[in-house]
């Protein structure tokens, strides 16, 4: 029903907002000490634990990107379509708009899943590690941790990727 969809959407928004907040707060802690390497190491070790966990409410949260730093963040074909839509919308003079996508899909077992995706935009602080003018020491550290890094040369407000939440829906 529409009411159920609305409840699920509100839960999804709250859950993703909390996940994004935890992610951002921890990175900011590393940055407050002017320690980009510390923030980078957190990204490498701890963020995956935060992002890719299933919880008791049948949710799965992923962080995906068309230009990932971490090889685990490549999108599925379905997620790639969402990211491409976000990029297209962003280019159409929506540089400050919060871009979201919601849909109910069938999974590989023909079960209904609610999908909520929210674009991740590049902020000023993100350019330290994802821009075109990265400090050489930091660049070496990034290459050590992520030899196949593609998450560079972003500009302010570019779409970095998205948080995508999947939730099982009982019929």
Predicted regions: what is each one?
Residues 123-133:
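The canonical Cys-X-X-Cys-His
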């Amino acid at each position: 029903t529409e009411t159920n969809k609305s409840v699920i959407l509100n839960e999804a928004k709250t859950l993703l907002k909390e996940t994004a907040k935890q992610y951002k707060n921890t990175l900011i802690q590393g940055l407050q000490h002017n320690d980009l390497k510390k923030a980078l190491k957190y990204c490498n070790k701890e963020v995956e634990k935060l992002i890719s966990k299933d919880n008791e409410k049948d949710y799965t949260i992923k962080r995906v990107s068309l230009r990932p730093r971490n090889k685990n963040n490549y999108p599925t074909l379905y997620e790639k379509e969402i990211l491409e839509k976000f990029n297209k919308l962003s280019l159409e003079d929506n540089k400050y708009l919060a871009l979201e996508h919601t849909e109910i899909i069938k999974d590989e077992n023909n079960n209904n899943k609610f999908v909520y995706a929210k674009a991740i935009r590049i902020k000023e602080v993100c350019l330290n590690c994802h821009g075109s003018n990265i400090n050489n020491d930091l660049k070496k550290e990034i290459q050590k941790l992520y030899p196949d890094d593609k998450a560079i040369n972003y500009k302010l407000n570019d779409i970095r990727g998205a948080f995508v939440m999947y939730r099982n829906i009982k019929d």
